[in-house]
């Protein structure tokens, strides 16, 4: 399956990435090869092969859900540079807006 350069540009725009023309061409070629290799898996005869979802023998290894004493809030906030309404205030890393 051929991945076009236009598809690469479209996904790059949605991902807020920018590539040069040579990078776009290289990505289109590489992604096309990857998709072709994955499509080869459809040709494998799996008749009679049991469904396998994991190779690990362990299933849902979890600890007991036990309530524990938390850290004293005053002690926790002692070294916090900025707080607001009993919450630790941190710099914003996500902004509202954009094309995605």
From Swiss-Prot:
EC numbers: 6.3.5.-
Keyword ATP-binding: yes
SUPFAM superfamilies attached to this UniProt entry: Glu-tRNAGln amidotransferase C subunit
GO biological process: glutaminyl-tRNAGln biosynthesis via transamidation; regulation of translational fidelity; translation
Nucleotide-binding as UniProt keyword: yes
Catalytic activity, as annotated: L-glutamyl-tRNA(Gln) + L-glutamine + ATP + H2O = L-glutaminyl-tRNA(Gln) + L-glutamate + ADP + phosphate + H(+); L-aspartyl-tRNA(Asn) + L-glutamine + ATP + H2O = L-asparaginyl-tRNA(Asn) + L-glutamate + ADP + phosphate + 2 H(+)
Broad EC category: ligase
Pfam families (UniProt xref): GatC (PF02686)
Sorted UniProt keywords: ATP-binding, Ligase, Nucleotide-binding, Protein biosynthesis
Superkingdom field: Bacteria
One of the record's GO molecular function terms: asparaginyl-tRNA synthase (glutamine-hydrolyzing) activity
Subunit structure, interactors included: Heterotrimer of A, B and C subunits.
Similarity comment text for this entry: Belongs to the GatC family.
The protein's role, per its UniProt record: Allows the formation of correctly charged Asn-tRNA(Asn) or Gln-tRNA(Gln) through the transamidation of misacylated Asp-tRNA(Asn) or Glu-tRNA(Gln) in organisms which lack either or both of asparaginyl-tRNA or glutaminyl-tRNA synthetases. The reaction takes place in the presence of glutamine and ATP through an activated phospho-Asp-tRNA(Asn) or phospho-Glu-tRNA(Gln).
Protein name, as recorded: Aspartyl/glutamyl-tRNA(Asn/Gln) amidotransferase subunit C
Organism listed in the record: Streptococcus pyogenes serotype M18 (strain MGAS8232)
